[in-house]
UniProtKB/Swiss-Prot annotation:
Main location per the UniProt record: membrane
Keywords: Cell membrane, Membrane, Transmembrane, Transmembrane helix
InterPro entries documented for this protein: DUF1328
Residue intervals passing through the bilayer: 3-23, 30-50
NCBIfam families: PRK13682.1-1, PRK13682.1-3, PRK13682.1-4
Location relative to the cell: Cell membrane
Protein name: UPF0391 membrane protein COXBURSA331_A2131
Matching Pfam families: DUF1328
GO cellular component: plasma membrane
Sequence similarity: Belongs to the UPF0391 family.
Amino acid sequence: MLFWVLIFFIIAVIAALFGFTGIAAASAGIAKILFFIFLVLFVISLIAMLVRGRRPKL
């Protein structure tokens, strides 16, 4: 699960870079939303992994 969160987080960061630099100004709002959604999912997954005491499968 952490693997997929990392993948989508990277996609959101790339989308944010395009949105914030003006390359795709129309999608900057979507990029911001995706960035924060996947940041929250990443943190939740990281906390869940630490609580369970398991190592992530990469």
